Amino acid sequence: IAHVGSNCQLEAMELARHAQEVEADAFAAMAPCFFKPSSVKDLVDFFTPIAQSAPDLPFYYYNMPSMTGVSLSVPSFLIEGKKTMPNLVGTKFTHNNLMEMGECLELNNGEFEVLHGYDEILHY
């Protein structure tokens, strides 16, 4: 999974196109941490052109509030984002809110993949 995240939307779009050109299996991006989106709509609006830059690859939202400072509803993002990003397949969920993670797993009968990214709470 190629990470294409950037505070610059145009740069992220270019990286997404490159990921598709080199036949990555998928791509992911974190929310911008400089000009932070303040709503799910803002987050969807930021990611839509990025996801559309590599329409043939699965796209994951890399949710990591501890690094980005963006803490918006991931289930709401997945539902709203799917409307404009057909290649949105899930999230890398790097947060300790297991209730929200469970909501993501159950959305639309398990439509979305949820990659667990918070290693500190995994048992060995």
Label each residue range with its predicted role:
Residues 1-70:
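Active-site beta->alpha loop and helix N-cap motifs at the rims of alpha/beta catalytic domains
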Residues 49-57, 64-124:
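Catalytic alpha/beta core domains of metabolic enzymes, predominantly
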